[in-house]
């Protein structure tokens, strides 16, 4: 049985496709499969990909490349990720022939108890507020990955990104569009305009954006290691900002932060084994969707058919209903992972799909009946090490609160 691991269903290309790669008269763009002998990087921005390729050319591992790419994306694509967010990764190590999983998500401040959170009609925590903050796990994730699989010093990984952030880079169309759409929500949040609205507005397509404060933060990380972020000057600056705006962070919260190496979970799909991280990340939903889809002749539908896309949407509705009901931090809750991944359970859920109409609402299933938000990147090196990494602010610019002194 062949094995793959993924954090999303994706197509990755390491180079721009030539015009001849795009067939005429098709409703979607296609690209030729790209082959490489010494490594490959896939990410959402070409400059980030270039940073990763430079690391591989310098003898770095796939993990080294992934760290550098993620750092670059935090500057180039702040509408999706950054040092203020969390990180999740899987690494295939060819030396041990083992798949490793890393959960580098942060926890809520210890002093933030539920009685301090304002009541909302829908029972959720206000996203664009200090009540949604968790300790940023990204930096610790970098150093955990580097300590286990890195080859080059961190200064060689973060230094070029710091230079890029200081000099600036043109903003691409899609990122500029997302940036502009976010302004109405974030323009009055503390620190946001100072860092992300140069000249009082979002940068337009093609305009150069720079973040010198982030550049300095990356240089301090490269020189001082993870402790400068969790026990040193960077933590002090973030906590001071938190105090100013009514947040709940403390130095002890930062000092207590740790990432966790976890065992990935998997399902099979038509002869392939697909891997994800267990909750609190939400990759389990992708595995549930695959289990549901396996009961349908997807190939016969054709990729452009209404049946194909209808099925994808309905399967996602079913998986997301379970996500809302069952997924949680497994340190504090029992998540029925095995039951949710049961093929029998998927078959029962699949029966709820009506190929003639869309479901207006979907209830979560009962997987126990028989038993009582983000950017993505991949990197591979010449030795066969593979990295799948997701890093996120949860949604767009996160809460919208920005610490000007550190640029995140």
Positions of PLM-derived features:
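Hydrophobic h-region of N-terminal signal peptides that target proteins for export
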Residues: 10-18
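A short acidic/small-residue loop/turn micro-motif
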Residues: 107, 394-396
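A short, polar/charged loop-to-alpha-helix boundary motif
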Residues: 112, 396-408
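Bacterial N-terminal signal peptides that target proteins for export
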Residues: 1-8
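Noncatalytic scaffold domains of N-terminal-nucleophile
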Residues: 20-50, 62-224, 229-231, 236-281, ...
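Internal maturation/activation junctions in enzymes
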Residues: 295-393, 403-406
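Short glycine-rich loop/turn motifs
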Residues: 37-39, 86-88, 262-264, 286, ...
